[in-house]
Each structure stands twice: as structure tokens, then as C-alpha cells.
Amino acid sequence: MARKMKTMDGNTAAAHVSYAFTEAAAIYPITPSSPMAESTDQWATQGKKNIFGHPVKLVEMQSEGGAAGTVHGSLAAGALTTTYTASQGLLLMIPNMYKIAGEQMPCVFDVSARALASHALNIFGDHSDVYACRQTGFAMLCSSSVQEVMDLGAVAHLATIKGRVPVLHFFDGFRTSHEIQKIEMWDYDDLADMVDYEAIDKFRAECLNPEHPVLRGSAQNPDIFFQAREAANSTYNAFPAIVEDYMNQVNAKIGTDYKLFNYYGAEDAESVIIAMGSVCETIDETIDYLMKQGKKVGVVKVRLYRPFVAEKLVEAIPDTAKVINVLDRSKEPGAREPLYLDVVNALRGTKFESCTINGGRYGLGSKDTTPADIIATFENVDKNEFTLSIVDDVTNLSLERGETPVTAPDSIVACKFWGLGADGTVGANKNSIKIIGDHTDKYAQAYFDYDSKKSGGVTMSHLRFGDDPIKSTYLINKADFVACHCAPYLTKYNMVQDLKDGGTFLLNCSWAPEEVGEHLPGQVKAYLAKHNIKFYIIDGIKIGKEIGLGGRINTVLQSAFFKLSGIIPEEDAIKYMKDAATASYSKKGEAIVKMNHDAIDAGAKAIVEVPVPAEWADAETESLFVEAKGDNKPLVDYINNVQNYVNGQEGNALKVSDLMPYVDGHMPLGASAFEKRGVAVDVPSWNPDNCIQCNFCAYVCPHATIRPVAMTEEEAAAAPAATKTADMTGMPGYKFAMTVTVLDCLGCGSCVNICPGKKGEKALTMAGLDSQRDQQEVYDYGQKLPAKEEVLAKFKADSVKGSQFRQPLLEFSGACAGCGETPYAKLITQLFGERMYIANATGCSSIWGGSAPATPYTTNAK
């Protein structure tokens, strides 16, 4: 049966299937599951019908616990009900999950599996949350890819209806939930054909109804509780066969080969991995690579994790297996991990009892697992407990890995884009991969990697496309095309080093071709020359400003990418990009749509090729790190040993011993002051002649990057040459300066907007960062000056002006440019900071306030 192909992410695939079978959905958003609920809400609002002929009834509750309670109640009333969640949200649902399972209600929870907060919060993927649900009585079905989410999502719903066991259908958070792939979609008519409608009628007939009243949820005593609990055994014993039957029905319809445990690899494999989740895709790809070299390797993919059917696992493993390595994406401190223990127990007393069975941990908190890690696993014989992708030099559990080979098929083209959070790079690449997927016969994949800055942080978009299916569920480190959308990144990150020989590098910058070489670090020039890289530049910022888009340069650079890649004929690419821009921005008005259309036209024409001189090959390497110095040794050590590496996107190189001082998750205060990201395009420039010294600008600044300074005559005379001052109002003998740390500013313009100025002329205007770099020295000088007690006495802390002469103990956070939350938090620290305890619930403020490696909270000289 041929199915329609469409480009979508895992969350959309899960929502598409669940919507078909769902009559009611109770939700509460949590990353990375929120898009599933959002899609369901959107479709219901649009009147989209499920297989029963009506839209889904959706309700958002006050928490995940409330959502689970609503699911339970809705099921009790006879409605097929679902929810979407992850991580701590899933944990809040566990009490109701016991009830739903115990009362044998048909239900599916779609879970984008995510790490649980332990020593630190982590919003990324692993299996900690779903493992915590093993005892609830929910069946657990795992999908390894976006396509499997679509296919096995149907199996989950069909099986729970017939088998009366609720199903937790899970897939890896971010790696699968947010990965975009070109996949085959279910048609709702085909899903409806497989539904057991008699089972639905039976479920509804047994639900709470005044026509046939019954009591559920009684309290049982020791005399009967145990027996009643054991009475469920037959239901669970029968359920795997029901799942298997629906897998077979799906296989017959769409030509797949889904089983409870699927084997892939050599028929005579001697080294076998057992795993579940997205890592199975990487294992498949690595197996293809190794088998070409004659290696006898294979993988058993766990589909139905609960109930765990031991005999089916035994059937899946090749008889020739000698070494079995089991991979768990979780850590169980003080014990071995769940899947490993399940496998050891299942193989006891079987023909595989004499095999070496090792267990390893991988991928915690979305740690990237590469083909090199898989090769190391296949080669592992004697390390019974091990870890992947890290260097554990403390307990020595890690497997050593070599260089990652190119294991993807030759047809696959890999592209990597470095963007600035909120510049539109991610959105543009989502459109690009959908254009490639939906308008060519090529396979397509996109994945997006972020830091934890709310906006203004670094984003990395990983795009792959080609003639073969794409199973590369790991980050690109061998690229055919790399684009840098933010020129300052060149002095912060190693990016051109990801290019293959003969690859293409596109740089968005304001430099003329003849002056580019003056700005490139030595290692960049050397790599371009030594590896025959084709080098292009484009001034996207200039084009964006001329058109009226400001810093939103996404469509400009998207157009440049299609021009250089040649994946689609230029005229077709421009048409598809304009269609996508119209769909994305039509609600914002025709003017915005036209601006984006103009940007697309301009981007394709504005690319300039830069010749790479041969002498660049001899350029000297320059350090990307600025060594911290100071008297605060714990802070300085942290900056030099941890923060610099993480901020340089080199955190994966840190060893376990490097993190030992911070094993409890604490961070030293004041670390954000060392970041000096310098990512703003424009920063405020102060004109003292127009200033009334109200300090409104400092008051509203979200990042504490503009601050008033009172100087004595002597201090002013000794100030850097670029210092601008005015006589201080109400304080004879003092000079006033409004200083800006331009390397910490995000360029939001809040200070300019609030500035009253004089006679219609503002004291602050926005100017290019490069023109204001000398103001950093002025700011640094001002911060070293002692506080002026006379000024603090004159201007009280309970006034706007007076408060801003007090040191903020919240500075340079990862909040969005123009954030409306941080100015209040900053002000509180200025008023009460010396005696504050801060308890922060999860949300925006926990990310801008406590996201590794830097915290914006700081201390004063005391």
C-alpha cells in the first residue's frame, strides 16, 4: 500500500496518529512534548475529524498531575483519552497511571522521553522518565525514528483498545521528537480499518453510567487485595500477542517487518548490541559500514519493552552470538540499569547463558552517540559495566573511541548552519528541509542543536539530504557545507573544521572580500587553504536592514544556501521559498510577506566568492579561549577549566575528573561576567549633552549592561581616552558617566526607547558594535572605581535614580534581548541582594538564572 510522503518531526507524527484514535485529550505542556498537544489543539480548533467523525475535545489543566487525573476520569466515563508529556511531567502522572492500568482502561500516553532533574536540570533526551514507570502496569512501546513513531503509534492505540492494557508509547526527546524526516503518513481510513470496534463497545458498556451503575476505586483489605492483583496476569500474558498481531497487520498494509524484537545485521554475528530508541538508527548505519569490512555484528532493537517477552528476545538473537552488549539510556545509581538486568534475566537458562553479557550507559541528557561509540561497543569484550561518549578518568568505566568515520551512504549531503538565537536561522532551515523533502524525490533530515540562552545564544542546524534513507541520529561532524550566520562566532568556535575536503563555507559578514582575511582567525584561514574549501561571503545584515527586516536574516541566507547547494533549480527554489514565507508570515500582513520575498530575491544575488590565497595555509593558530585571572580562585578555576570549554562548544572534551568539584551541581557565582559574547549588531552610544541623568536606561536594562558611574575629578582625569562625562547633577565635584559593557549587551534598544533626552533629542542612540568597542574599556574602568558613599546618601535606594547607583547582583543573563522579567529581578538584587535567599521554580527564570556553564547571579566586594 502506497502512502503519502510528507516532511515532519516526530512530535507531529505522534500527534497525527493519536488524533485519529482520540476522543478527548487532557494536556499540560512540558518540553519536549509540547508540540504534540499544540498540534492536537490546533487541529481540533480547525474542526479536523478523528476516525470516529468528530474533532477531539481538548482541555488544558493546571499541571501534569491534573492532566493525568482528567485522563483517568474521562476514561472512566467511556471516552478514548490520551495525553502527551515527558520528564517530571510524566512523574507527576504516575499515581494515576497505576489506577488507569489497574482498572484496565484503554489509553495511550505519548512520551518524548527526557532526562529527570538530578544534580541539575536537563531538558534533553534519555530514558530516565520512562524507566520510572516500569512498575505502573502500563505497557511500554518504543519507537526509534520519526517513521516508527508514525507506524508504531498506530500499533499502540490499536493494541490498547483490544487488549485493555494502557500503553506508554515513547521515543527519544529532541533526537526523535524534534528531528524532521521525510516519512510515509497514515491515512485515517486505513487506521479505521484495523480498529476492533467490538472492543470499544465493550469498554464503553463497562464504564460508569447511570444506566448500569457500578462502583470503582474501592478499598480492599489484606484478605483479597493480593489475589485481585494477580488476577490481572492473564491480561498481561495475552497482551504481547495482541501487539504482535497488530504489528503483522501493519506490516501487511505497508510492507514493514515490525516485531516485538527486531534483529538487524549479519546472520552469523558474533558481537550483538541490544538497545532501544534512536541509537538503533545509528547502530544500523554503523553495522552497514562494518559489514562491508567483513565484521560479524548485529543489533536487537527492543520494540515492546513492557511486558518484556523473554522468549521473543531469545528468538531474535543469532545463534552465533558470543558477546552481547546491552545499552541503557539512563543511570541507576548503586545498581545496574533496567534493560541490562532484563536481558541478563531473560537469557539465564537459555542457549545464550554462556555468552558474555555487558551493560553500558549512553546518551544521558542527549549526549551525542556517534558511530565511533558504536564501533567501540561492538569491540568491547571484557568491560562488564561501561559508558559511552565520555572520558571517565575517575571510575574508569568509559570505552575509548577512535575518530568517527563517515558511515552514511555516499549520496548523503550534510550541511551545518551556525546561527544566533532568534535570528531566524532555525526557522529557515525547517522550511528548507521541508522544501527539499516535499519537492524532490530525495530523503531529508533536519535536527537543531541549541545552547540554553533564551535568545541570542548559539544555534546549530544539522541538515542532511540524499538518495538513500537517512539513519544518522547524531550530530554532523563531517559536512559538505557549513554556514556561519554570525561573524563573531569565528573567534569563539571551531566550525570550518567540520568541513570535508573540497566543501563549501558561507560567511555572513559586513566585510569586503579584500578585507576578510584581516578578520579571520589563523586556524580558519589555514583550514580553508589546506582543505581546498570554497569560500563565499554575504552581507545579510545590510540586506535585512535595507529591506526592513532588521536582524531577521533567515530568508536572505536561506536563499543563498539554495543558490550554492544546487539541490533544486534556482527558480524553483525561489518559488518554494516564497510560498513558505507567505504561509509563515501571511498573518503579519502583506508588507511583511513582501519584505521576505524581497529578501529571498536579494539573497540569491548577493553571494560573493572569496579566493583563498595559498599562503593562508601557513597562518598560525589563535586561542579561542580568554584565560580568566583574578583573586577568586574557585571562580577563576571554574572559568578556565569548565566554562571556557562549554562556551566554546568544546564541553564534550571535558573528563569526569574536570566535573568532580561540581558533582552536586553547584556553580560559582559571577561566572557570566567572563562570557563577553559580543553578539549584538548594534549597542547604545551615549551623548552626555542630551542626558538628564535620570538613570531610566539602567533601570530598564534586562541584562545590567548599561550602568551609571560617579567619578571624582581625579578619577575622570585618569579615565580611558574614550570616556565621556558630564558634571553630575546635584553633586558638585563629581563627574557622571553612563557606561556600557558592549560585549555583554544584546542590543535590544530598551534603553534608547525609555530615554527622555533633552529637547526631543535622546541621549542614547544605537550604533554598530565595532564603532563602540572602545567603550568596553570605559565600562571596565568604571566598575573598578569605589562606590561613592556621598552619592548613595544623596540618591536613596528607593528611587529609580538612586537604585541604579547600587550594584546589581544579577548581570549578563541568558534572557532574551528586551526581556521584561529580568529588570525586576535585577532591581530586587540592587535593593535587597546582600540578604537574599532565592528559590526558583522551573521556567524561564531558571534557565536565564541558572543555566550551565554561567550563572548571572553574582556577589559584591563584601
Where are these regions (language model features)?
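Ferredoxin-type iron-sulfur electron-transfer modules and their immediate structural context
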Residues: A573-I574, S586-C745, V752-K862
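Conformationally flexible catalytic loops at phosphate/diphosphate-handling active centers
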Residues: F52-V56, V167-N262
